């Protein structure tokens, strides 16, 4: 009977997931159809406008340009089109990946190089599978038709993760930026034994299929366990060789009558919602996204390009006049230039740093202190407009030697910079952690929330204390993450998924000797935010929280009742150091006590309001990932009546009734190791049924209290 119930639950879960995906497919297909209708209208206007000019382009040229634009169209906003664009082995040592590749981590048997791991790469074209750096073309599967050209960018991004390695001596400079130095560079990737599926980020018909899909539909239908996305929307100032020639093009709104300008950097919009929908319906899909390379772009700080252009109300590019008030450069105040599409809640957004230098000016240094990490000048900065922390993490993105190719296919090499390269570094590390996780935990996979939690909890401090808008939660450290997985396997840390039910609190008691920081981090896959803004003035810097299920993490000193709160940013002054308080915008919460007093601490997770699902209906629970480190033991509960005989739950009866003559204040359930696994705070009731259906068979201790009474009882569940 129990087996039948388990099968029914599993089938029910799969059915619910499929229903969610079917609904999402219908919504996304309708959006894509509407998008192409908008583009068709836009194309007709462009053709008419071109034919009406004194010096029109040829019909073949205008159609070629429109065909490319149709492939990369992302969305329209107030009638204006926005397009996708690509964002352009020292990094192995910088992030301590070599410890995993070489098998030098205590507690792990053997080395890990991506064996058995597959990554889907969504990029600017097909990956050249025959490049010598991949060793074998069998490692690359191009999902696109042969009509999509090979891409040097896609090949380089894939090589960052999976290249076998190629050494090259190049001329660089010392820290002074002047003195020349010869350095040895290598293309070796994070996972030289992994395999890759290659997709074009634009609109296309996949090989063997008949229906055109955009990148979101390709992600939704292929359901990759791990995917890399080194591209994004072009927002704000963009240096382009556009229709008006080489210059800065303002990808936003501008009103010449009053000089008012708006952009959509930091705005949660269509692509963000779609990605959150996809991951919510498929919680084991880990999506990694580059933050963008727009920091500092604009005419104010780049005077060598004299042409500055904006779209008028008809969508025509016109030049700013000498009396126009130019929009500020991207991130002119040091923040707010991550584009929409990279601020989704359930993905991992990656910023870029310079390589860590050694004392002898090499590029293969290791992290030893905060000042080792330098922000890459181009790396886009957060936060999301409601103040949520973006990027989530930072990795090396500068001075990268990578395998490249021509559009026809060739083995070449290049050196480049960009969050395009920091993102696959993080993706590769997640792949290695996934391989380690499988080896330690019977082939199981990390889900999206747990993968993100592992990144954030083990990140090295960078920039301001706590999270910030340049580095997110810090600099990625592959070794620390692998070590934490070993500690989980040895039951030395808490790293698990838990369910929070409405109107309940989950509590864990831990004891520390005060010799190390006590840190807890929770991450959850949140329902998508259903935005309703469709004008620039409403969308620009919209401070409304995009969080749907607002979970709260607190750590309380049991002896003193002092409560410790999570990090948060000020949305109106996000470059200021993070403070601690009630975080109402992030689906990540972390509480850090740098110097805890020795004693017992209560780690509590609760929620505000009512939990809902992705359709907005009331949800029974919200699953979250929690990591706790820095404790020395998990204490037993205060009362365990060892002499009492357990109350046996009858077969099929999974509820225990608690009844007092006055209102019940608290109900708690412990396992026999003393770990608190359920905490309930009933609201103004004298009787309450405690549901044990979600617990495995075993003996539990139930405690309950009111103002003047206490109850403690052992429960045996078969």
Q: How would you label these PLM feature ranges?
A:
Residues 18-22, 90-210, 219-227, 232-244, ...:
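Subtilisin-like serine protease catalytic core
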Residues 28, 40-121, 141-150, 268-280, ...:
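N-terminal domain-start motif of subtilase-like serine proteases
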Residues 122-134, 353-424:
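Catalytic-core environment of secreted peptidases
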Residues 194, 435-514, 613-614:
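C-terminal subdomain of the subtilisin-like protease fold in secreted/lumenal serine endopeptidases
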Residues 393-465:
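Hydrolase catalytic cores
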Residues 450-452, 540-547, 555-557, 582-584, ...:
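C-terminal edge strands of extracellular/lumenal beta-sandwich accessory domains
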Residues 473-549, 618-633:
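Secreted peptidase-domain scaffold signal
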Residues 640-718:
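C-terminal outer-membrane/trafficking sorting elements
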């Amino acid at each position: 009977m129990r087996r039948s119930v388990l099968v029914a639950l599993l089938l029910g879960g799969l059915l619910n997931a499929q229903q969610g995906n079917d609904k999402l497919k219908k919504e996304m297909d309708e959006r894509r159809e509407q998008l192409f209708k908008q583009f068709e209208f836009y194309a007709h206007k462009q053709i008419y406008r071109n034919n009406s000019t004194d010096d029109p382009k040829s019909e073949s040229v205008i159609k070629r340009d429109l065909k490319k634009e149709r492939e990369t169209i992302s969305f329209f906003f107030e009638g204006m089109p926005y397009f996708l664009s690509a964002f352009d082995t020292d990094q192995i040592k910088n992030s301590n990946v070599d410890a995993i590749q070489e098998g030098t981590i205590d507690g792990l048997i053997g080395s890990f190089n991506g064996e058995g791991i597959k990554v889907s790469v969504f990029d600017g074209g097909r990956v050249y599978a025959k490049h010598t750096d991949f060793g074998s073309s069998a490692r690359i599967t191009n999902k696109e038709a042969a009509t999509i050209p090979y891409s040097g960018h896609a090949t380089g991004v894939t090589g960052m993760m999976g290249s076998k390695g190629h050494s090259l001596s190049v001329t660089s400079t010392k820290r002074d930026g002047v003195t020349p130095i010869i350095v040895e560079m290598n293309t070796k990737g994070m996972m030289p034994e992994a395999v890759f599926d290659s997709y074009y980020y634009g609109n296309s018909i996949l090989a063997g299929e008949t229906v055109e899909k955009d990148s979101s539909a390709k992600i939704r239908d292929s359901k990759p366990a791990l995917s890399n996305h080194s591209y994004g929307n072009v927002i704000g100032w963009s240096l382009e060789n556009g229709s008006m020639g080489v210059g800065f093009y303002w990808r936003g709104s501008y009103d010449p009558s009053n000089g008012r300008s708006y952009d959509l950097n930091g705005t949660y919009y269509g692509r963000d919602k779609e990605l959150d929908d996809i991951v919510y319906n498929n919680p084991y899909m880990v999506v990694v996204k580059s933050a963008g390379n727009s920091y500092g772009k604009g005419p104010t700080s780049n005077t060598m390009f004299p042409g500055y252009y904006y779209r008028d109300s008809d969508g025509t590019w016109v030049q700013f006049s000498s009396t126009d008030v130019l929009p500020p450069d991207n991130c002119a105040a040091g923040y707010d230039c991550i584009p929409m599409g990279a601020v989704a809640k359930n993905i991992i957004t990656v910023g870029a740093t310079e390589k860590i230098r050694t004392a002898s000016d090499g590029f293969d240094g290791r992290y030893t202190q905060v000042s080792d990490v330098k922000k890459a000048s181009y790396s886009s900065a957060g936060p999301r407009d409601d103040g949520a922390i973006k990027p989530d993490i930072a990795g090396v993105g500068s001075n990268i030697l990578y395998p490249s190719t021509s559009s026809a296919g060739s083995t070449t090499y290049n050196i480049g910079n960009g969050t395009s390269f920091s993102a696959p570094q993080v993706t590769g590390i997640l792949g290695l952690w996934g391989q380690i996780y499988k080896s330690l935990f019977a082939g199981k996979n990390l889900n999206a929330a747990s993968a993100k939690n592992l990144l954030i909890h083990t990140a090295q401090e960078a920039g301001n204390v706590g999270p910030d808008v340049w580095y997110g939660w810090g600099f990625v450290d592959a070794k620390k993450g692998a070590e934490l997985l070993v500690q989980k396997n040895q039951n030395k840390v808490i790293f698990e998924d838990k369910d929070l039910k409405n109107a309940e609190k989950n509590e864990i008691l831990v004891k520390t000797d005060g010799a190390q920081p006590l840190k807890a981090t929770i991450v959850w896959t949140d329902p998508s935010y259903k935005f309703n803004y469709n004008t620039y003035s409403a969308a620009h810097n919209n401070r409304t929280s995009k969080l749907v299920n607002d979970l709260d993490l607190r750590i309380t000193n049991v002896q003193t009742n002092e409560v410790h709160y999570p990090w948060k940013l000020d949305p109106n002054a996000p470059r200021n150091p993070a403070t601690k308080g009630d975080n109402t915008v992030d689906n990540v919460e972390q509480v850090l006590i740098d110097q805890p007093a020795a004693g017992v601490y209560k780690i509590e997770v609760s929620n505000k309001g009512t939990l809902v699902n992705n359709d907005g209906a009331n949800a029974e629970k919200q699953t979250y990932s929690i990591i706790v480190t820095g404790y020395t033991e998990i204490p037993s509960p205060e009362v365990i009546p060892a002499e009492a005989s357990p109350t046996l739950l009858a077969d099929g009866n999974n509820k225990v009734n608690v009844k007092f003559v006055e209102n019940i204040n608290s109900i708690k359930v412990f396992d026999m190791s003393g770990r608190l696994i359920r905490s309930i705070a009933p609201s103004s009731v004298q009787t309450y049924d405690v549901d044990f259906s979600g617990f495995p068979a075993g003996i539990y201790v139930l405690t309950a209290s009111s103002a003047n009474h206490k109850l403690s009882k052992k429960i045996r569940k078969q």
